[in-house]
Amino acid sequence: FDDYGHMRF
């Protein structure tokens, strides 16, 4: 999923 502030999985 898209975790804004970290990485995009």
Curated annotation (Swiss-Prot):
The keyword RNA-binding does not apply. Pfam families: Sulfakinin. Its main location: secreted. It is found in: Secreted. The modification Sulfotyrosine is found at residue 4. GO terms for cellular component: extracellular region. The modification Phenylalanine amide is found at residue 9. Keywords: Amidation, Neuropeptide, Secreted, Sulfation. Signal peptide: none annotated. The keyword DNA repair does not apply. InterPro entries: Gastrin/cholecystokinin_CS, Sulfakinin. GO terms for biological process: neuropeptide signaling pathway. Myotropic peptide. Belongs to the gastrin/cholecystokinin family. This is Neosulfakinin-1. It comes from Sarcophaga bullata. The lineage of its organism: Eukaryota, Metazoa, Ecdysozoa, Arthropoda, Hexapoda.
